[in-house]
Amino acid sequence: MLKPLGDRVVIELVESEEKTASGIVLPDSAKEKPQEGKVVAAGSGRVLESGERVALEVKTGDRIIFSKYAGTEVKYEGTDYLILRESDILAVIG
């Protein structure tokens, strides 16, 4: 399993709908980049200049919304993930 370092989290993307409300099927090229995902792993936290470690506000299992162009896409064991910094997370769902 991927283990993120510091203030980074590993996200499994939640794919958007493939059809519009009127039933039109969208090709991959017309879909927007997903901004929602599920945290599958979280780093140990951010280190302050004083050396103190601050724990992350998100945890494994949280559903989140993140900045549109944030993070680095990686493929691991056939699954697509996104690794991003906690500061790129905009909200936790639920």
UniProtKB/Swiss-Prot annotation:
Keyword Chaperone: yes
CDD domains, A to Z: cpn10
Annotated GO CC locations: cytoplasm
Swiss-Prot/TrEMBL GO biological process terms: chaperone cofactor-dependent protein refolding
SMART domains in alphabetical order: Cpn10
GO molecular function, one term: protein folding chaperone
Domain of life: Bacteria
SUPFAM superfamilies according to UniProt: GroES-like
InterPro entries: Chaperonin_GroES, Chaperonin_GroES_sf, Chaprnonin_Cpn10_CS, GroES-like_sf
Localization per Swiss-Prot or TrEMBL: Cytoplasm
Keyword Cytoplasm: yes
PROSITE patterns: CHAPERONINS_CPN10
Pfam families hit by this protein: Cpn10
Function of the molecule: Together with the chaperonin GroEL, plays an essential role in assisting protein folding. The GroEL-GroES system forms a nano-cage that allows encapsulation of the non-native substrate proteins and provides a physical environment optimized to promote and accelerate protein folding. GroES binds to the apical surface of the GroEL ring, thereby capping the opening of the GroEL channel.
NCBIfam families attached to this UniProt entry: PRK00364.1-2, PRK00364.1-6, PRK00364.2-2, PRK00364.2-3, PRK00364.2-4, PRK00364.2-5
Similarity-based family: Belongs to the GroES chaperonin family.
PANTHER family: 10 KDA HEAT SHOCK PROTEIN, CO-CHAPERONIN GROES
Complexes and interactors: Heptamer of 7 subunits arranged in a ring. Interacts with the chaperonin GroEL.
Protein name listed in UniProt: Co-chaperonin GroES
Species whose genome carries this gene: Bacillus licheniformis (strain ATCC 14580 / DSM 13 / JCM 2505 / CCUG 7422 / NBRC 12200 / NCIMB 9375 / NCTC 10341 / NRRL NRS-1264 / Gibson 46)
